[in-house]
Amino acid sequence: MATMKTPIVQSPFCPLYHHAIELIGRRWTGAILRALLSGQHRFSDLTATIPGLSDRLLSERLKELEAEGIVERTVIPATPVRVDYHLTEKGLALGEVIGAVSEWAETWLVDVPAPDPERECDAGEPAISSTTAA
């Protein structure tokens, strides 16, 4: 019979863990990270992908993630100017974390009604594909 490993917690408070969980736990940050795990996106792509997220809050979160070295902003000189966002190596490393949270949600939050049936998770599909982070 397989036994589940209990994580070893060396201290009840770890400043690094606290900073990480506060960062990725901010409102809309998880949704932004999950969207960016599928590749590079323009600002308008992100607003279309994440319903209910205001332009102001998206801009604020992207700036925070950029300051943390998780997201990179690329300005493409064209007419009109194009701005793309993508995850850095540091951001891509969060893929396993986002995937684990998605799996946990699909296991334990199945009774929570989806706000929009068209936006439900694909049952049986992995939340984060290991091939999208390339």
PLM features: residue spans?
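C-terminal regulatory/oligomerization modules of transcriptional regulators
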Residues: 1-12, 41, 67, 72, ...
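N-terminal helix-turn-helix DNA-binding core of bacterial DNA-binding proteins
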Residues: 11-57, 63, 68, 77-79, ...
